[in-house]
């Protein structure tokens, strides 16, 4: 029950008090009339309505909690996923490429696991990315490091870090870094082969396979615009199976930056977690995008595989 207020004793009003009350009343009467006149101005009325629509849109966006409206979470950051796989119908993308029996996808889908790469391995492989990216970095929000080709984001361009830095690279990386990289790749390759019922030896590491570091800095070039929806098989013809190993944690290390499978009705999202592996067939059945990162820094490594040995690349070697 609300506490009762004791009524204040009113003092008798003199002429001065009455005049002050009349002036105050006049000001109050004038204020609504001034507001009314302002709203009668077309430009201000339009601006006010526009602000109302913007506010409504922002509230709706906040309530949905996703860039693309309705979304279902395939894997939450806080859960440990032993193994989750969803089969989806294969697209026709693979028909326009040379087929390899026992490898080219006939069973398509997407999977997530948190038990293939340990958190400790994820921390160690992230340190490899941090060491390499410390040599450069994009002016925009997305930087890449490709240990295979040597590509490194520097400003608005890319350099070959092996040629650009020469022997100094041996003071940045170690043989252990490259051994760990190879072991992580092998574990991911075996996971994909098992999930899709194919031989691991039929999968060939392909390009581009690279580290990514994303923050909230405004894009400076098209390479920084990582958030557009795309199909890997269309963007990179060599891709048959795509995987992502996350090296940082959603809502701990960064905000936004969730991975989204684009579907009619409801997108399927994967919330990054250090050590989490997300993998999928690379055709149009898995159209996807990444949310813009709103704060913090998101680290991941994209590891791609092809069924075509002509598109294969070797593991990077310590220089």
From Swiss-Prot:
Residues binding Fe cation: 230, 232, 288
Lineage of producing organism: Eukaryota, Metazoa, Chordata, Craniata, Vertebrata
Name by which UniProt lists this protein: 2-oxoglutarate and iron-dependent oxygenase domain-containing protein 3
Lumenal domain ranges by topology: 66-319
Location relative to the cell: Membrane
Gene field: OGFOD3
Active site residues according to the UniProt entry: 298
Recorded superkingdom: Eukaryota
Cytoplasmic side of membrane: 1-42
Group of enzyme by EC: oxidoreductase
Biased composition (Basic and acidic residues): 18-34
């Amino acid at each position: 029950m609300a506490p009762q207020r004791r009524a204040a004793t009113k003092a008798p009003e003199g002429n001065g008090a009455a005049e002050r009350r009349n002036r105050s009343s006049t000001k109050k009467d004038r204020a609504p009339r001034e507001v009314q006149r302002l709203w009668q101005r077309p430009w201000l009325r339009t601006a006010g309505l526009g602000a109302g629509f913007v506010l409504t849109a922002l509230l709706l966006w906040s309530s949905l909690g996703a860039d693309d409206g309705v979304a279902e979470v395939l894997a939450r950051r806080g859960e440990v996923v032993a193994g989750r796989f969803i089969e989806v119908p294969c697209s026709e993308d693979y028909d326009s490429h040379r087929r390899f029996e026992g490898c080219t996808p006939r069973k398509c889908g997407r999977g997530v696991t948190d038990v293939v790469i340990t958190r400790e391995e994820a921390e160690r492989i992230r340190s490899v990315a941090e060491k390499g990216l410390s040599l450069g970095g994009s002016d925009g929000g997305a930087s890449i490091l490709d240990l295979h080709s040597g590509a490194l984001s520097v400003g608005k361009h890319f350099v070959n870090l092996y040629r650009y830095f020469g022997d100094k690279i041996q003071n940045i990386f170690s043989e252990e870094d490259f051994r760990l990289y190879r072991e992580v790749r092998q574990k991911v390759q075996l996971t994909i082969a098992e999930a899709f019922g194919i031989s691991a030896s039929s999968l060939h590491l392909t390009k581009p396979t690279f580290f990514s570091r994303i923050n909230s800095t405004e894009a400076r070039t098209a390479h920084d615009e990582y958030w557009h929806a795309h199909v890997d098989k269309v963007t990179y013809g060599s891709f048959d199976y795509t995987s992502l190993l996350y090296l940082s944690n959603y809502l701990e290390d960064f905000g936004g930056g969730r991975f989204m499978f684009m579907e009619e009705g409801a997108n399927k999202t994967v919330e990054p977690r250090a050590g989490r592996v997300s993998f999928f067939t690379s055709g149009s059945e898995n159209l996807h995008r990444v949310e813009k990162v709103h704060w913090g820094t998101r680290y991941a490594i994209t590891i791609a595989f092809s069924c075509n040995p002509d598109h294969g690349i070797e593991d990077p070697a310590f220089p």
